[in-house]
Every structure is written in C-alpha cells, then in structure tokens.
A protein has these predicted regions:
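Short gly/ser-rich loop at a beta-strand->alpha-helix junction or flexible surface loop bordering the NTP-binding
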Residues: 1-166, 183, 282-288
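Surface segments flanking catalytic/ligand-binding clefts of nucleic-acid enzymes
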Residues: 7, 12, 58, 142-288
Length: 288
C-alpha cells in the first residue's frame, strides 16, 4: 500500500489504487460516510474538520471551531464536533451544520479548503456558548492569527439581525490576544469582573541595556504589579521551579509585586486571587 494522507474518501482511494477493499475494511475506520482514518489514529481538531469537509463532498465551508483550528488556534478540544456552514438536510454524528449567509469577503481558502476568515470565525464564536467560553476562544484566535477586533465589529454592524450580538459586543470588550492559555483568560476575567483595573498582558521587563529579563502574563505596569498563572509544570519540574525562583527574585529586585495563581486557587478560591491582587495594587499606589 502506498503512502496515504488521511482523512480520505474511501471510494477515491480505491479508484486510485491506493489500497484494496480488504485493506480499507481491516486497516481503516470510517468516521463519516465514505471518510476514513487509520484504525490507530486519533482525530485532532484539524483532522476532524477535514474529515467533515470530505463528508460534505468538499462543498461545505468550515466554520466556528473547525475554521479556528485551520487558522492554527490552540486549546480546541479534540473531541468537540466539527462545524460546517452548508444549508443541508443531511446530518452526521460529530458534525454541527450551520446555514448562515456568508458574504464573499467572509470566507477564504487554506490548503484548498474553504473556511470562514478570522474575522467571520470570531464573529461566530463570540455569539455562541457562554461569555467565558467565547472570550477564551476569541483570545486564542487572536493569539494565533492577524485578527483585528475592528473587523469583527464591522461584521456586527453588517449583520444587525444576527443572534447573540449583545454577547458579542461584551466579548469584544473583554478579548485580549495576549492570553497564552484558557487559564490566563479566566484569571484576567476574574480580575476585571471583580472591579479591578483591566490588566495589560505579556508585560516585558527589561534591564538597563534593554534586554528582556521576564515577560509577565498580565499586570499593571504603572504600579509594578504582575499576576502569573502557573501551570502544573511550574510546581513539579525541578528545573522550571529553579528558574521561577530566580526570575521572581529578579522581578522583586526591580520593585515588582507578583501574585501567583494556581489551578486550585482559580477554581476553588478565586476570592483569594482577587484579594492578593487588590492588596498588591494598593501597596503599589493604585487609587482603587
């Protein structure tokens, strides 16, 4: 059997002589009608999107999370269903079908696959699911692409009758492409939702020669207060732990107060995060 990219349409692979019917039955798994992947393979957000597009006969437009995946957006769970934009009565397990009207400037082509532009993708993601989820998804899309929120606002003005515009406008006010993980987004939303000033993201701290010593997840440069979300490896990896200790000493030597946030704090004791950030801001001279 020759090398075979996947997902693929079974009838096309057979017609091209890339495999035999026996190989197709025994070595591959059908994920949608006539669409196959190797039995040992696991679908990612990208390959799940491509599989859905192949199921449509290459006629649908990737939308929502599937479009975001092809725009290289991170933090999309692999198990989430693919999303296509195509007026159709057909249904397939694991595929969400939308029937939105898309203007010509709201779609683009990537590797031969038609999908919604970053702006249109953001327009759709920001209107769906809850506020926090929508902000997380927009943060990730902004971080991965050249998305400009002004372009999303233009689409909101164009499609004034679309559902979810109230949430979309709230999401646009809260989104920030500087977030590098969903937990960073959640931390920022917690701080803003508690009445603290909106923090900057990815603050660079430099020495007297302009060399970057540290990049702080978020904070308030005017008052030298930083907030950092530490993933599990910051606590379990000895080398990372040593680097963090040295880095914190460097920042404190330059007058910074750092509030460290863990998953447990964020999930179970968010009030502690807010209290520590508020205390640090007051100590730094912020007029709260």
């Amino acid at each position: 059997m020759r090398s075979l990219d996947w997902p693929f349409r079974g009838t096309e692979a057979l017609a091209a002589g890339l495999l035999t019917p026996h190989q197709l039955r025994n070595d591959f798994e059908m994920v949608h009608r006539n669409v196959y992947i190797p039995r040992a393979a696991t679908l990612t957000a990208v390959t799940r999107a491509i599989a859905a597009w192949l199921w449509s006969g290459r006629t649908a437009t990737l939308a929502g999370l599937s479009a975001a995946a092809l725009h290289r957006t991170a933090w999309i769970d692999d198990w989430l269903p693919a999303e296509l934009n195509r007026p159709s009565q057909d249904k397939a397990r694991g595929i969400i079908l939308h029937s939105d009207t898309l203007d010509d400037d709201e779609t683009t082509v990537c590797h031969g696959i038609r999908l919604t532009t970053p702006a249109r993708t953001a327009f759709d993601l920001a209107r769906r699911k809850g506020l926090t989820t929508a902000v997380i998804r927009l943060d990730a899309l902004m971080h991965a692409s050249d998305l400009k929120l002004a372009d999303v606002e233009l689409l909101a003005n164009r499609h004034r009758g679309a559902r979810g515009l109230v949430q979309l406008r709230r999401v646009l006010l809260l989104a920030d492409g500087g977030a590098e993980s969903p937990c960073e987004t959640k931390t920022r939303l917690l701080l803003v939702g508690s009445g603290l000033p909106r923090p900057q993201t990815q603050i660079e701290v430099v020495n007297q020669w302009g060399t970057v010593l540290a990049r702080i997840d978020m904070g308030w440069e005017d008052w030298k207060v930083g907030v950092e979300f530490d993933g599990a490896h910051h606590w379990t990896d000895p080398a990372q732990r040593t680097r963090d200790i040295d880095r914190l000493a460097e920042l404190e030597a330059r007058g910074w107060r750092i509030v460290r946030v863990s998953a447990d704090l964020l999930r179970h004791r968010p009030h502690v995060v807010v209290a520590r950030a508020r205390s640090a801001l007051l100590a730094g001279g912020c007029p709260l």
